[in-house]
Amino acid sequence: MSFDINWDKLVSDDSISNSIKDFLNDQFNEISLPSFVDTLSVTGFSLGSIPPNITIRHIGNPFDEFYKRNVPEEEAKKGQLPVSPELSGSDSDSSEEEPAINNLDSTNQQDFTPLLPEVDSLRRQNQESKHFNNFNMNNVGLGHMDLDTPTNFFNPHAYRLHSNSVGRNESVKKNDNDIQFILEIDYKGDVALEIVVNLLVNYPSAHFITLPIKLKITDLVIHSLAAVAYLENSVFISFLCDLNDADSDYFTSASMHRRSDAHSRGSHIPPSSGGNITDYVPSNNKERIDVIRSVKIDTEIGEMENNVLRNVGKVEKFLVEQLRNIIRDETAWPSWICLDFNDDDDDDDDDDDQPSTASTQHSSHTS
């Protein structure tokens, strides 16, 4: 089953792009910068004109974790829908900072206890998806699966939550209208992210040269399985695992060899007009999910010496690694993004005819 997305409406809403830009800028500002970078800021973001291809693989009930909320007392008094990092077992709390788009770390990765799903029926149900990764789930405590599909993701009761949270726990009441879609997202679009950094040359002395450079990250490639759940007038989004392309096997030795070669040489294109364009694909690993499969970076620089160009390459690699880490840590299971469409003032009848704006909820994520 497939459906069309009115991508133009998303692109035309500048507030969405600005929210994503501000969120990424906040995340990058929390990163410890290497010695060859002074400052880093996200200056622009565009969703582009090409929408993702989305295929519905399963429709069912939302994961139980989406109903488990830890309620700080101050948020409970305000009547807000709470999101707290305590479910992840973390003592840190950065909920005072409110970037526009944030994740909820649903639980400690080691707190998952797998329940045996009805494997045979699920295998028959999803036999059309034979190109899914035969991935290793040990990094989230689910054990290795020898099936062609991540069948546990299609079982709404496949995980039992053991919460070691501190504070008052609340469970959102289940409703007959609650629904969850397991989606295959295949995106090869023209999303663009612009970043400005100050490149430092620390020879012959520290901060000997400070060179501002502008980097544009484009050609984002994502092919993943994601859960999108709707409950209590909120939308939960979480990436579950990366998927194979239909014509290749991500974990075969030949495929890994090609990816390793591409990663080592970076698919460089000769610089033109002081710029540098580099393709970046993920390094050879068998992690459950990267989300971002590959990106391209266009760097605007002047005519510089080779040692400066080498530092530019380090900056590019650093940015790609950090961007991939941010997206994975903030949106990949057991973390998720929650878009809250509940109005703050339910008794405000004057705004009934106005479209509801999505607000997002914040919690810290401990890697």
From Swiss-Prot:
**Residues of the SMP-LTD domain:** 1-342
One Pfam annotation reads MMM1
Q: Which gene encodes it?
A: MDM12
- A molecular function (GO) term: lipid binding
Compositional bias annotation for Acidic residues: 343-354
InterPro entries for the chain: Mdm12, MMM1_dom, SMP_LBD
Membrane topology value: Peripheral membrane protein
Q: What is its main location?
A: mitochondrion
Any idea what this protein is called? Mitochondrial distribution and morphology protein 12
Give me the ranges of the annotated region Disordered: 74-112, 261-282, 343-367
Stored HAMAP family = Mdm12
What does the record give as the function of this protein? Answer: Component of the ERMES/MDM complex, which serves as a molecular tether to connect the endoplasmic reticulum (ER) and mitochondria. Components of this complex are involved in the control of mitochondrial shape and protein biogenesis, and function in nonvesicular lipid trafficking between the ER and mitochondria. MDM12 is required for the interaction of the ER-resident membrane protein MMM1 and the outer mitochondrial membrane-resident beta-barrel protein MDM10.
What's the domain of life for this entry? Eukaryota
